[in-house]
Curated annotation (Swiss-Prot):
This is tRNA(Ile)-lysidine synthase, plastid. It is found in: Plastid. One of its GO terms (molecular function) is ATP binding. It comes from Helicosporidium sp. subsp. Simulium jonesii. Keywords: ATP-binding, Ligase, Nucleotide-binding, Plastid, tRNA processing.
Length: 280
């Protein structure tokens, strides 16, 4: 029964994809991104469509290395090109990134990576409805302005003017690892008028329109986190659990681990699921 629901969802997901599509899928080896990759592999099977993975390595805890190696193994098994983005802050001077800084860093890395693609990619992110609801409460409880554009399924973001450290691994063609460009902090690599300097490493980027918008799609927003949990249990996906999700030091984890369970006890077992419907 559950498998029928999964494949019916995969069929619905096909409506988001055009006949020819260059997909950049964010991948952390967690249950959300793993299920998204599972769906995309079943959908993108013909030669006209391309799929690439991107993994952001935070270096903030020892368990991150497990996700790092799991991403490499999955990419090598399915012969999918993998891009690894490394965190650039100096951990000796700054022990923790704020949640907003970490989120902005991830989105910027997705957009910068789009500059490396020959064709304009569609960025697929494994955000569920639970993530969007947490984002809403995160803004609401901090008394900040709530941008409802963040709650929509599709987003359009401007590509930033700087380019960061990337390691690109193409398993289909070769196993070589190429370091792309240099650190964004080195201002010598970028002119004041935002035109990239002329050299062989950056010639391809001079052809890019840095004012273009990149489409960010979140196809799992109709699903609750518990739904994804049941799917990955049934499919036996080899996910890596992020222990930082249990750390209530972070604001979002307090919303997820404390606020939502209390709401289910006091009001309704499906309170958070019902609230998600407001943003769809």
């Amino acid at each position: 029964m559950l498998k029928n629901i999964i494949y019916s969802y995969i069929t619905q997901l096909k409506n988001l994809l055009s006949k020819k599509l260059n997909v950049l899928c964010t991948f952390s080896a967690g249950q959300d991104s793993f299920f998204l990759l599972y769906c995309l592999i079943h959908i993108i099977s013909n030669k006209n469509n391309k799929i690439k993975l991107q993994h952001n390595h935070h270096f903030l805890q020892s368990s991150n290395i497990l996700s790092f190696w799991q991403c490499i193994k999955v990419a090598s098994i399915f012969k999918i090109p993998l891009v690894i983005n490394l965190l650039e802050i100096n951990l000796a001077n700054k022990d923790f990134m704020t949640e907003n800084e970490a989120r902005k860093w991830r989105y910027d890395s997705f957009l910068r990576n789009s500059l490396f693609q020959n064709e304009k990619p569609s960025i697929f992110i494994g955000h569920t409805g639970s993530d969007l609801l947490e984002t809403f409460f995160w803004h609401f409880l901090r008394n900040s302005i709530i941008d409802y554009q963040l709650i929509k399924k599709k987003l359009l973001w401007n590509i930033p003017y700087y380019i960061s450290n990337f390691s690109s691994v193409g398993y289909k063609n070769s196993s070589k690892v190429k370091i792309k460009l240099t650190n964004k902090k080195k201002k010598i690599n970028c002119l004041i008028n935002h035109n990239l300097m002329l050299n062989k490493a950056k010639k391809s980027f001079l052809k890019k329109d840095l004012t273009q918008l990149v489409l960010i799609t979140r196809p799992l927003v109709n699903l609750h986190r518990q739904d994804i949990f049941l799917f990955r249990k049934n499919l036996k996906l080899p996910v890596i659990t992020d222990k930082s999700n249990d750390n209530n030091y972070y604001y979002r984890n307090r919303i997820r681990n404390i606020l939502f369970p209390i709401m289910r006890i006091l009001f309704n077992k499906k309170t958070d699921k019902n609230l998600i419907k407001l943003f769809l």
